[in-house]
């Protein structure tokens, strides 16, 4: 899997955590063998060493992942963990940054409908394609453009929305479109057959129609970046926004999201903001293929309404995150 993807490409193998080179401004391929416990412990140790060395150890770098598991579990979850950790050290990730190979390789079965090859050969083919996309990835900075903001929280009581407005007041060079997803306004995806979904997607629509077709999908299509405002509901993304993510398939069928960046504002009453951030990584970067900029999320703990304003250094953190957004929207 690894050999076939890096053949004829100059590379450096890093496997000694006590002799780590400078990994800033590099193309990084994270390779993991997920064991019975669901982790690649040596890779976790390497990432821990990088954090210990410098929390900005991966600034300016872009990553992708090849992950193999001894069974049919753990690849996707561990990928989210790696991306989350590396992203918090300044690493960005291309859209669809992962090729995962479960123990049985059955996860490649659906590919056989379009690629008439043995499962193992499909694995090698996709791995090679991923590394090629990583190597040629050279996005350009965008100094002005459009940002769509999706949220479902009520205006009067939302710490998440308040935090976003602390951030957005510093963003002046981009046009911002805030879209509230009201309760029950977006029905979840019913899983239309592929051809039917493709049919509606080509017409810039969806079987259900409604606010998704009239407002959300056109806004995302026109935007250079999408900011997701996610209060932590039981360590999960709010149901309304989950429905939006699921319904993006209609647009995704028609064109990829590789040139669109995602950011997140996550507020928890207690803990668990990392759980929500990882779900966004899994759904939007790994599955749907949005670009993941470095330090893509700002996270805070605030329970009662308006207590976000009492969080230590929140104004400084908000202004810093606004610069993360404006400096990392690339096409």
Q: Which positions does each model-derived feature cover?
A:
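Cysteine-cluster motifs in flexible loop/terminal segments that predominantly coordinate metals
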Residues: 184-217
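FMN-binding flavodoxin-like domain, especially the glycine-rich phosphate-binding loop
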Residues: 1-175, 217-222, 228-230, 235-331
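The conserved SAM/SAH-binding core of class I Rossmann-like methyltransferase domains
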Residues: 150, 179-182
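Hydrophobic pocket-lining residues within nucleotide cofactor-binding pockets
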Residues: 181-184, 232
């Amino acid at each position: 899997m690894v050999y076939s993807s890096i053949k004829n490409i100059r590379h450096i193998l890093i496997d000694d955590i006590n002799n780590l080179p400078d990994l800033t401004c590099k193309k990084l391929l994270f390779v993991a063998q997920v064991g019975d416990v669901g982790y690649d412990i040596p890779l976790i140790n390497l990432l821990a060493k990088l954090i210990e060395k410098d929390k900005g150890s991966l600034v300016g770098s872009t990553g992708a992942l090849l992950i193999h598991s001894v069974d049919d579990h753990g690849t996707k979850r561990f990928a989210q963990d790696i991306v989350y950790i590396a992203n918090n050290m300044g690493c960005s990730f291309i859209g669809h940054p992962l090729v995962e190979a479960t123990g049985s390789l059955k996860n490649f079965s659906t590919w056989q409908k379009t690629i008439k090859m043995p499962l193992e050969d499909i694995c090698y083919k996709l791995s090679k394609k991923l590394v090629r996309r990583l190597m040629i990835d050279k996005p350009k900075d965008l100094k002005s453009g459009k940002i769509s903001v999706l949220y479902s929280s009520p205006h009067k009581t939302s710490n998440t929305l308040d935090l976003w407005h602390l951030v957005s007041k510093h963003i002046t060079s981009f046009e911002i479109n805030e879209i509230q997803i009201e309760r029950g306004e977006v029905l979840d995806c019913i899983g239309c057959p592929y051809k039917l979904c493709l049919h509606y997607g080509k017409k810039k629509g969806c079987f259900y129609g409604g606010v998704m077709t009239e407002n959300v999908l056109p806004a995302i299509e026109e935007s250079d970046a999408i900011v997701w405002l996610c209060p932590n509901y039981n360590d999960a993304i709010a149901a309304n926004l989950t429905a939006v993510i699921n319904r993006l398939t209609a647009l995704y069928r028609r064109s990829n999201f590789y040139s669109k960046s995602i950011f997140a504002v996550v507020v928890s009453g207690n803990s668990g903001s990392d759980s929500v951030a990882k779900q966004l990584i899994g759904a939007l970067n790994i599955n749907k293929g949005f670009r993941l900029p470095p330090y893509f999320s700002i996270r805070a703990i605030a329970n009662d309404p308006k207590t976000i304003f009492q969080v230590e250094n929140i104004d400084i953190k908000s202004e810093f995150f606004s610069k993360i957004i404006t400096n990392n929207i690339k096409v």
